[in-house]
């Protein structure tokens, strides 16, 4: 499936999918969630853009398989709600274990702002498996886990391709 139409929310394009937006609009409109735009996640991708990517991909896959698309969409937007730039976090705090600790921080922040189901809580808390030792309990958790890895890889690869573009272009014969 190809979804091309988009609308802008806080300078970020989001899918113009009425069913998806109905599930996540309250999250997208929250000022602290919108502040994720200020933090870089992968390459030049903001934490908000990454979370929207993960959320929508997880939503589509779960919807198309008859699983709990709402839980996947909402947890996807909140899975990285740690609210700091992890590139500088270790130097500033001495915490060198962002990969291990940010799921709990994201969950704590999400619980302060929104009412979450047990499934959504587990998806957020377990999205870094196998780096963290306990896997998700639900199929939606595994979908989000893989969507997160896929989107992160694509975001970094896009940056690498941009940087290496001049090197990778074929030479023109003279």
Regions found by a protein language model. Name each.
Residues 1-174:
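Metal-dependent phosphohydrolase cores
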């Amino acid at each position: 499936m190809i979804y091309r139409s988009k609308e802008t929310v806080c300078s970020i394009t989001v899918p113009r999918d009425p069913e998806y937006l109905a599930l996540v609009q309250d999250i997208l409109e929250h000022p602290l969630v919108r502040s994720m735009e200020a933090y870089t996640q992968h390459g030049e991708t903001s934490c908000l853009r990454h979370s929207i990517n993960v959320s929508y991909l997880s939503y589509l896959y779960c919807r198309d398989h008859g699983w709990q698309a709402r839980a996947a969409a909402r947890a996807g937007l909140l899975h990285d709600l740690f609210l700091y730039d992890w590139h500088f976090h270790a130097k500033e705090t001495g915490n060198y274990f962002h990969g291990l600790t940010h799921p709990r921080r994201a969950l704590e922040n999400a619980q302060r702002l929104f009412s979450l189901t047990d499934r959504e809580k587990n998806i957020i808390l377990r999205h870094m498996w196998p780096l963290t030792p306990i896997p998700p309990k639900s199929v939606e958790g595994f979908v989000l886990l893989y969507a997160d890895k896929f989107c992160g890889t694509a975001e970094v690869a896009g940056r690498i391709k941009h940087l290496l573009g001049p090197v990778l272009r074929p030479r023109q014969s003279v």
